[in-house]
Amino acid sequence: MTASELVAGDLAGGRAPGALPLDTTWHRPGWTIGELEAAKAGRTISVVLPALNEEATIESVIDSISPLVDGLVDELIVLDSGSTDDTEIRAIASGARVVSREQALPEVPVRPGKGEALWRSLAATSGDIVVFIDSDLINPHPLFVPWLVGPLLTGEGIQLVKSFYRRPLQVSDVTSGVCATGGGRVTELVARPLLAALRPELGCVLQPLSGEYAASRELLTSLPFAPGYGVEIGLLIDTFDRLGLDAIAQVNLGVRAHRNRPLDELGAMSRQVIATLLSRCGIPDSGVGLTQFLPGGPDDSDYTRHTWPVSLVDRPPMKVMRPR
């Protein structure tokens, strides 16, 4: 069925595509740790923290998860993407196992980007369920991981659990008592509008680019991984195309604060998200990187040209590299 046919069917049914929330949406998760541990039923859980120069936040992220290790969580690793600061030292001091990209899959030459790190983490972990948590979070809630694995442990047919949350633009807004927003600019200005145009059924996914999510190993190892910041949108669309909306859940994590990036970096991120989304929808991408002109000089009379590369090359499903 084409996207146009799906849209027509939704309109005939009296609702706009993506207008209704997923049936598998948890707004206020109520599972206890004990209930989730019992629901594991022999399954194992790995938590992966992809990191690149996150010395300022890596310790607090690990500290929010480490009390769960040897209980709900069976494995916690930091997948380091070539940090040049003290990320590795601080992660080890906090009790995490640190694995480099090269160590995770030594027989395969390394490529840059987040998608590469997440893909390689599948070779460095063994859990039946894999949870990804970004390492730049500021004071993350200690129940992020339990909330994300809850639908996988207690639901039927769920393979991917995305997070959603309020995203303040300024870190100071988190404790101000004001219901501030403004974060997630790439999500709101690029990803969700494009999904509305090309995959309207996914309009009910509040945070398609969220870096906090969980999935079954069976699913993750069967999918290609898009490069760089295209990895999240690629996994979401691939899961939907393969298994449908019923396989995707989302959980409210409350508030998420992290280091917000400048607009030039967000432009590069957006370019990769667009390239991946177009490719997943069968639309050819030019493969041309994003050229920006950055003002400088005392009177902004000088502009520096900078081109960010974009990649159209996925990594193959890990099952191809490491059959089990």
From Swiss-Prot:
Covalent S-S links between cysteines: none
Catalytically driven reaction(s): an NDP-alpha-D-glucose + (2R)-3-phosphoglycerate = (2R)-2-O-(alpha-D-glucopyranosyl)-3-phospho-glycerate + a ribonucleoside 5'-diphosphate + H(+); (2R)-3-phosphoglycerate + UDP-alpha-D-glucose = (2R)-2-O-(alpha-D-glucopyranosyl)-3-phospho-glycerate + UDP + H(+)
Entry binding sites for (2R)-2-O-(alpha-D-glucopyranosyl)-3-phospho-glycerate: K114, G184, R185, V186, T187, R256
Keywords on record: Calcium, Cobalt, Glycosyltransferase, Iron, Magnesium, Manganese, Metal-binding, Transferase
GO BP of this protein: UDP-alpha-D-glucose metabolic process
GO molecular function, one term: magnesium ion binding
Cofactor remark: Requires divalent cations for activity. Mg(2+) gives the maximal activity, but the enzyme can also use Ca(2+), Mn(2+), Fe(2+) or Co(2+) ions, but not Zn(2+) or Cu(2+) ions.
EC number: 2.4.1.266
CC cofactor: Mg(2+); Ca(2+); Mn(2+); Fe(2+)
Residues binding UDP-alpha-D-glucose, per UniProt: 50-54, 81, 114, 134-135, 229-232, 256-261
Lineage: superkingdom: Bacteria
Top-level EC class: transferase
Gene3D superfamilies: Spore Coat Polysaccharide Biosynthesis Protein SpsA, Chain A
Amino acids binding (2R)-3-phosphoglycerate: G184, R185, V186, T187, N260
Functional note: Involved in the biosynthesis of 6-O-methylglucose lipopolysaccarides (MGLPs). Catalyzes the transfer of the glucose moiety from UDP-alpha-D-glucose (UDP-Glc) to the position 2 of 3-phospho-D-glycerate (3-PGA) to form glucosyl-3-phosphoglycerate (GPG).
Complex formation: Homodimer.
UniProt similarity note: Belongs to the glycosyltransferase 2 family.
Additional comment: Was identified as a high-confidence drug target. The glucosyltransferase GpgS does not possess a putative nucleophile residue that could result in the formation of a glycosyl-enzyme covalent intermediate. Therefore, it is expected that the reaction would proceed through a front-side substrate-assisted SNi-type mechanism where the breaking of the glucosidic bond is stabilized by the interaction of the acceptor hydrogen atom O3 of the acceptor 3-PGA with the beta-phosphate of the nucleotide sugar.
Protein's UniProt name: Glucosyl-3-phosphoglycerate synthase
Species the sequence originates in: Mycobacterium tuberculosis (strain ATCC 25618 / H37Rv)
Upper lineage: Bacteria, Bacillati, Actinomycetota, Actinomycetes, Mycobacteriales
